[in-house]
């Protein structure tokens, strides 16, 4: 009873922190000047991380097993993993764009957990026989950590694509505007003044330089985080194969979850291969990562909606 009450309190605290965090995050998107609000949002993510840690420990204590037996618990662990990834750049006081991705991911996932959509799974239950194994913690934790890192890395790639394509659209619109303004007497007079030419050129070159630097950093950090996630995913799949052989007598059964996990692994293996090819630009790799981002959510949520296969114990119904 004490554990249940404690979990209930921690759930409400995390929900409150997430609600405040979402509000602050939306305000900072429109008002960049308020730095204090952004710092509050960052600290809110850390508070959420502590609450989620308390939730996981509490569920572990009164259920007697590591809390990764259904979708609700795995989402809790996913938001905890996002918060862990968020902690590293936060403690180093750098890479604010990485923290923006991880904090928004934590807020979104924890908001989904506390929204009531998965209320049927919030009550801890006795593990089904297939899950009563020491491999549960190893396999599922590695898979979820892999998903978290791959999702964060993919979102950085999506940000890279947005910046790149916005730049391409601006260049295209500027070319059209230049052709239109070339016949304007006022525009010609403005361009002929040396001071205006220097100011305009220096502003554009400085802006392009910082944009290029940002694209480079997004590309580098995306590659690093995806590489880490790929290692976790590989360990998770291999440990799952060993567990499957012990439980069902076969390393691989090609049920929906296993099939989509393999597709996810293949997609990010292709991504890492493109990183080794000097002929591939960062945009091409980012497109592969974006496709991988979609595939992860199909593997994580889409397969659970089917409710079939050897992994159907983690499924849920939307009714």
Curated annotation (Swiss-Prot):
GO terms for cellular component: chloroplast thylakoid membrane; plasma membrane. Pfam families: Cytochrom_C_asm. Disulfide bonds: none annotated. Its main location: plastid. It is a multi-pass membrane protein. InterPro entries: Cyt_c_assembly (IPR002541), Cyt_c_biogenesis_CcsA (IPR017562), Cyt_c_biogenesis_CcsA/CcmC (IPR045062). It is found in: Plastid, Chloroplast thylakoid membrane. GO terms for biological process: cytochrome complex assembly. Keywords: Chloroplast, Cytochrome c-type biogenesis, Membrane, Plastid, Thylakoid, Transmembrane, Transmembrane helix. The chain crosses the membrane at residues 9-29, 44-64, 71-91, 143-163, 225-245, 259-273, 286-306. It comes from the Eukaryota. GO terms for molecular function: heme binding. Belongs to the CcmF/CycK/Ccl1/NrfE/CcsA family. Required during biogenesis of c-type cytochromes (cytochrome c6 and cytochrome f) at the step of heme attachment. May interact with Ccs1. This is Cytochrome c biogenesis protein CcsA.
């Amino acid at each position: 009873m004490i554990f249940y009450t404690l979990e209930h309190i921690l759930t409400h605290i995390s929900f409150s922190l997430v609600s405040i965090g979402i509000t602050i995050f939306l305000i900072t998107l429109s008002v960049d000047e308020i730095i204090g609000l952004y710092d509050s949002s960052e600290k809110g993510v850390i508070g959420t991380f502590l609450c989620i840690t308390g939730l996981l420990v509490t569920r572990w204590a009164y259920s007697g097993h590591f809390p990764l037996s259904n979708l609700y618990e795995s989402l809790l662990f996913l938001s905890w993993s996002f918060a862990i990834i968020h902690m590293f750049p936060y403690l180093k006081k750098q890479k604010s764009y990485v923290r923006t991705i991880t904090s928004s991911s934590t807020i979104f996932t924890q908001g989904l957990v506390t929204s009531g959509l998965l209320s049927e799974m919030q009550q801890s239950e006795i593990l089904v026989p297939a899950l009563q194994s020491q491999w549960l913690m190893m396999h599922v934790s590695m898979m979820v950590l892999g998903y978290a890192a791959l999702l964060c890395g993919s979102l950085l790639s999506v940000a890279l694509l947005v910046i790149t394509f916005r730049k391409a659209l601006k260049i295209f619109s500027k070319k059209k505007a230049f052709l239109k303004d070339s016949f304007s007497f006022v525009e010609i007079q403005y361009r002929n003044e040396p001071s205006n030419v220097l100011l305009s050129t220096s502003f554009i070159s400085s802006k392009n330089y910082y944009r290029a630097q940002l694209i480079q950093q997004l590309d580098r950090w995306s590659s690093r985080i995806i590489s880490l996630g790929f290692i976790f995913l590989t360990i998770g799949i291999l440990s799952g194969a060993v567990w499957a052989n012990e439980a069902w007598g076969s390393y691989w059964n090609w049920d929906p979850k296993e099939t989509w996990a393999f597709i996810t692994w293949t997609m990010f293996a292709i991504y890492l291969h493109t990183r080794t090819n000097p002929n591939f630009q960062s945009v091409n790799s980012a497109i592969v990562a974006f496709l991988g981002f979609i595939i992860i959510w199909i593997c994580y949520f889409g397969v659970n909606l089917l409710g079939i296969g050897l992994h159907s114990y983690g499924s849920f119904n939307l009714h």
